[in-house]
């Protein structure tokens, strides 16, 4: 953010127009999270953004995404060959059903639990498949489903709506 400010960027509105936007997508094979600056590497939304993956594949097709456990070319192939659906997942304990219902309602999606367990672990909606993986599940198994993958912020579900809305918007532009 310091570099952006030095180049004249003023932060007025999230996802508003700006002079420059620098995103750190990957750094070797390491994972980094700084909650104070809101920096997360790998970038949490790069796995479903074609405009990020296509140029990345041109320069580093075999580079591994340390969270997804797939190469950049595999991630791009995954979004090119799957249904028009976004899979969401969170490390939180099952998340907030009420929050997800509200988000789906606000986006005009239907919300239905597709699990018989008392606290459903999977929810389906139009273009949304909200998924809370078990701790034992590997990244490979999480990626095995259909649709691009978006990892929801683990600290607070109040921002999920913005993240999901941005993902749906990106999907609709593809």
Task: Briefly describe each language-model feature range.
Residues 85-107:
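Glycine-rich phosphate-binding P-loop
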Residues 110:
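Residue-level detector of anion-binding/catalytic polar loops
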Residues 1-5, 9-92, 113-174:
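Flexible, gly/pro- and Lys/Arg-enriched active-site loops
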């Amino acid at each position: 953010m310091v570099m952006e400010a030095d180049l004249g960027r003023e932060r007025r509105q999230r996802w508003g127009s700006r002079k420059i936007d620098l995103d750190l997508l990957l750094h070797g094979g390491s994972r980094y999270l700084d909650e104070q600056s809101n920096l997360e590497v790998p970038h949490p939304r790069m796995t479903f953004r074609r405009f990020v993956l296509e140029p990345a594949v041109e320069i580093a097709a075999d580079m591994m995404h340390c969270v997804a456990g797939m190469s950049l070319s595999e991630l791009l192939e995954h979004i090119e060959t799957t249904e028009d659906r976004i899979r969401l997942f969170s490390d939180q304990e099952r998340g907030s059903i009420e929050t997800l219902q509200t988000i789906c309602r606000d986006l005009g999606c239907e919300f239905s639990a597709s699990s018989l367990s008392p606290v459903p672990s999977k929810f389906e909606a139009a273009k949304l498949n909200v998924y809370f993986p078990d701790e034992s599940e590997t990244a490979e198994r999480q990626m095995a489903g259909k649709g691009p993958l978006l990892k929801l912020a683990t600290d607070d579900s109040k921002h999920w709506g913005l993240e999901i809305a941005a993902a749906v918007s990106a999907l609709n532009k593809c």
